[in-house]
């Protein structure tokens, strides 16, 4: 579709206005417990975390120190400095205690008849996510966002759900200070069975010049319920909020 350049301020109306209204997203910020170290049963709902530190997410377990030059001793050869032999170095990662294992725990309520996804903006690193004692997903990379659908692991009896996250930073795993822990936001996303999944919408502008722009929109629709007809309505709005074009697709 071709439209004037000023129309590149676009809004994809999800799968229709009604579907947008049925999606909710909340930050899981407060009521977290944290402890450095590894704990065999920390993923289980009955685990006693009352003596753990109360924290707010985002949280970095190493940023407050203590600083110690021995925290990041590395026997390495820095190739960018044209070194050919390894030598003992310190301070390359800030001298902060980011190495080690840590656990985070919290609880949340979620409706049993919806689809529930957890989105982590960043978790450093090797994140193992548990819901009610069962592993939901694993993500090794600390800088990338990731998400996992946890619907099948939720309590169906109205009880709160226990979320536990195990993180591990290995020695000499970084050349700079990488951070440690749940250092970015955690989102709780609740949708209907028919929904646009996380990152399910892509908007690109493959051709742009002073006279026109081509806007390409692609949306994925997931249906975790019974098979039914699905209507997807897409609108492009002008900067003033007026509908410039509308397209409707139906799937059975």
What are these regions (language model features)?
Residues 22-119, 179-182, 213:
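Extended carbohydrate-recognition surfaces in non-catalytic/accessory domains of CAZymes
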Residues 1-23:
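Bacterial Sec-dependent N-terminal signal peptides
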Residues 217-221, 231-234, 246-247:
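Intrinsically disordered, low-complexity terminal/linker regions enriched in Pro/Ser/Gly
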Residues 213, 223-228:
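Edge/loop elements at the starts and ends of beta-strands within beta-rich repeat scaffolds
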Residues 45-46, 228-234:
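Short flexible loop/turn segments that cap and initiate beta-strands
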Residues 51-53, 137, 244-245:
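Aromatic (tryptophan-biased) beta-strands that constitute blades/sheets of beta-rich domains
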Residues 24-28, 37-38, 94-202, 224, ...:
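Accessory beta-strand-rich segments of carbohydrate-active enzymes
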Residues 207-219:
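Contiguous beta-strand segments within globular domains
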């Amino acid at each position: 579709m071709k439209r004037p350049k000023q129309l590149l301020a676009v809004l994809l109306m999800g799968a229709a206005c009604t579907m947008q209204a049925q999606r909710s997203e909340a930050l899981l910020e407060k009521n977290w417990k944290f402890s450095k170290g590894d704990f065999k049963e920390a993923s289980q709902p009955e685990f006693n975390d009352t003596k753990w530190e109360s924290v707010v997410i985002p949280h970095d377990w190493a940023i407050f120190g203590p600083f110690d030059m021995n925290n990041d001793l590395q026997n390495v050869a820095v190739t960018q400095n044209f070194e050919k032999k390894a030598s003992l170095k310190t301070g390359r990662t800030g001298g902060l205690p980011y190495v080690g294992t840590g656990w985070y725990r919290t609880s949340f309520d979620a409706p049993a008849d919806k689809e529930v996804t957890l989105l982590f903006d960043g978790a450093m690193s090797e994140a193992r996510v548990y819901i009610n004692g069962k592993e939901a997903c694993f993500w090794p990379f600390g800088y990338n966002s990731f998400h996992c659908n946890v619907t099948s692991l939720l309590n169906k009896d109205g009880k709160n759900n226990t979320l536990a996250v195990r993180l591990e930073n290995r020695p000499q795993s970084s050349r700079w200070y990488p951070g440690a822990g749940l250092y970015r936001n955690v989102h709780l996303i609740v949708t209907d069975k028919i929904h646009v999944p996380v990152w399910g919408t892509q908007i690109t502008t493959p051709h742009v010049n002073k006279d026109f722009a081509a806007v390409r929109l692609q949306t994925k629709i997931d249906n975790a319920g019974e098979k039914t007809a699905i209507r997807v309505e897409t609108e492009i709005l002008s900067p003033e909020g007026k509908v410039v074009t509308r397209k409707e697709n139906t799937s059975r």
